Each structure stands twice: as structure tokens, then as C-alpha cells.
A protein has these predicted regions:
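Hydrophobic transmembrane alpha-helices and their helix-loop junctions in integral membrane proteins
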Residues: 1-202
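Feature representing long, continuous alpha-helical segments
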Residues: 78-79, 91, 107, 144-147, ...
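Hydrophobic membrane-spanning alpha-helices of multi-pass integral membrane proteins
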Residues: 23, 126, 207-221, 242
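Hydrophobic core segments of alpha-helical transmembrane domains in multi-pass membrane transport
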Residues: 30, 127-131, 168, 172, ...
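Aromatic-capped, Gly/Pro-kinked transmembrane alpha-helices
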Residues: 228-261, 274-332
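Alpha-helical transmembrane segments and their membrane-interface junctions
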Residues: 129-144, 215-236
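Transmembrane alpha-helical segments in integral membrane proteins
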Residues: 173-188, 262-283
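Hydrophobic alpha-helical transmembrane segments
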Residues: 160-172, 248-269
Length: 332
């Protein structure tokens, strides 16, 4: 999509609007699905869906802002970098959990992270960066993309773009909510009564090193936005068709911090007003998570599997037609 936007349809506003609409739908839908899920791997998969939506919003801003796309160009590239490192961290974390417990349901992996400070810290690196907490790469990238949306809203005076901004902040809040759900379940709740005893040694030296290599750059890049992160993004401007900054970005200015404060507030409201009272239940003295997401709303069952079956039928028909044509050619 980035290549199509930059090289095949440069400056095409209709394409930019289409990408923006797809981005908004994707980032909100993925976040909502993650809030309702109780399976760790499925939550992380929905997280990827949502974060791709954020990236698509940044790609759309590249086109819609035209020559004033410096914020979008830097933010989109850094968002892709952040997404790669965060997902590497969190999926490795999920692998560690599954390797030790052979479970992925939050009700079965509760308390696994208790007494594991290194795993605790590495998870927080990934989660805080994904949530856009200041001091992490995710804050830098999310701030740049958010400010690009704000710039377009001011430039055009469009109510629709203001709605996009609030969808951006809402999705960020939902991100905070489902990450808090995972964090509390794995690191603070007590383990199920029938869970097997977990060893404090949760990974091999190689797996621990892999997790550290993925997680540690997140705060490093977040604490050095001008000296490191922006230089990485600037090296890609010739590819993204972006422009360099005309002035320094003040990441800790209130105007930039305000966005993350709003998202954090939304996230805490969703966690304490939706997840805790409605998506958990107390049974036998234990807090258990439950999923209220309707089965018929499953993307896998209602979209992907039917589409896959349809594609197979189409390909089978094409192959049959090709075979018949070859038979005719042989007969002729």
C-alpha cells in the first residue's frame, strides 16, 4: 500500500481517502475485538490488525497532506518500526507463556508472570511502547501520526478529519485497556488452583536474549527521538516521498502529551467500566475472564473461511476450463 501510495498514485486524494477509511475501520475493529477476547494469541493477532490500521492512517496522511507531510512521513516509518519490534516482543512473550503452560487462555495462564521480574520488565517494554507511553518508541511514532491528523484537520477544517482524530484516540484507549487486561491477568492475579507449579526459570538463554534484543531498543529509541529515531526516519524520506521537518518537534509539550493522556483516560475507563464489571466474573473465589463477542461476528468464520472456500472454487473452475481447452486443442 505504501508503494502504491507513493509511486503509483502519488497525490491522488481519492486513494488517500480510501486508505484513510480502511485504516479507521481496521484500527477500531481490531482494538474492539482484542478487548473482548480471552485468548492471548488471538488478542495479539487483533492487536496487529489494529496497529496496521494506525499505519494506514499515517500512509493516508502522506497523500492528503501533500508537501506538508513531514510529520506523516516520519511517523509512518517509525510506526512500522515500532510495530515490528513490539510484535516481536509480545509474540515471543506469548511463546514463552505457551512453552511453559501449554495454554493461551487468560483464565489458564493467570499468574504465570508472578516472580519473574525480567519477563515482567520485557513485557512492559513492549506493552508501554504499543500503548504510546512517553519514553518509548511507540509514543514518538504515535505522536507524529496523530499530529499529522491534527494538521490536516486544521488545514481543511473538515469535521470528518476531526472524527478520524477521535477514532485514533479511542483506538489508542482500547489498546491501553486490553493490554491492561493481559498485564493484570498474567503478572498480578493468582494462578488457577489446578495449575502446575511454574519454575522461575521461564526460558532458555537464547529465548531470553531474543526477547531482550526486541524489547530493549523500544525505550532507547523513545528516549532519543531527535538523536536516533528521527534520523532513522529521515533516511527513508527518499523512499516515502516525505519532506524533512521545518522545525523541531517538542514531544513533551502539552499539545503532544494531551493525546496520550486522553487515550490513557479512555483505556482506564474501558478497563474499569467494561472489562472488570462485564467481561469478568467471580467463580469459586477466583476472577475469570469471559468473552461476550458474538460467534457470528468472527472474521475468521464469517469472512476469511468463506472467502478461502470461494477462491478454491474459482481456481478449480479455472483449472477445469484450462484442462478442457487443452483437450480441445489436442483433438483439433
Amino acid at each position: 500500500i505504501l508503494v502504491v501510495t507513493v509511486y503509483l498514485l502519488p497525490g491522488n486524494r481519492s486513494w488517500g481517502v480510501l486508505v484513510l477509511i480502511l485504516g479507521c475501520i481496521t484500527m477500531v475493529l481490531g482494538a474492539v475485538m482484542a478487548v473482548f477476547s480471552t485468548n492471548l494469541k488471538y488478542i495479539l493477532a487483533c492487536t496487529s490488525l489494529s496497529q496496521i490500521g494506525f499505519i494506514l492512517v499515517g500512509v493516508a496522511m502522506l497523500t492528503l497532506l501533500g508537501e506538508h507531510n513531514a510529520l506523516a512521513a516520519h511517523g509512518t516509518v517509525l510506526y512500522m518500526l515500532n510495530h515490528s519490534l513490539v510484535k516481536l516482543t509480545l509474540f515471543l512473550f506469548a511463546g514463552v507463556v505457551y512453552y511453559n503452560t501449554h495454554q493461551l487462555d487468560l483464565n489458564r495462564i493467570r499468574g504465570f508472570g508472578r516472580g519473574k521480574p525480567l519477563l515482567h520488565g520485557l513485557f512492559l517494554c513492549g506493552a508501554c511502547s504499543l500503548a504510546g507511553i512517553p519514553g518509548f518508541l511507540g509514543y514518538v511514532s504515535k505522536t507524529l501520526v496523530h499530529e499529522a491528523v491534527v494538521e490536516l484537520a486544521v488545514e481543511t477544517g473538515s469535521t470528518a478529519i476531526t472524527v478520524v482524530e477521535w477514532l485514533f484516540l479511542l483506538s489508542g484507549g482500547l489498546t491501553v485497556a486490553y493490554l491492561t487486561k493481559i498485564y493484570v491477568a498474567v503478572f498480578w492475579q493468582t494462578a488457577p488452583a489446578d495449575a502446575h507449579a511454574a519454575s522461575r526459570r521461564w526460558g532458555t538463554p537464547l529465548s531470553v536474549a531474543a526477547l531482550m534484543l526486541a524489547a530493549i531498543p523500544l525505550p532507547m529509541l523513545g528516549l532519543l527521538p531527535h538523536g536516533l529515531s528521527e534520523k532513522i526516519a529521515a533516511a527513508t524520506l527518499s523512499f516515502t516521498g516525505g519532506h524533512d521537518f521545518s522545525h523541531a518537534v517538542h514531544y513533551l509539550a502539552w499539545e503532544n502529551l494531551k493525546g496520550v493522556v486522553i487515550s490513557l483516560s479512555i483505556g482506564m475507563l474501558v478497563y474499569f467500566l467494561l472489562i472488570r464489571p462485564l467481561l469478568t466474573e467471580r467463580r469459586d473465589g477466583e476472577i475469570r475472564y469471559r468473552s461476550l463477542w458474538p460467534a457470528w461476528l468472527s472474521l475468521e468464520e464469517s469472512v476469511y473461511k468463506p472467502l478461502f472456500r470461494w477462491l478454491i472454487r474459482v481456481l478449480m473452475t479455472l483449472c477445469r476450463v484450462a484442462c478442457d481447452l487443452l483437450d480441445l486443442l489436442v483433438l483439433v
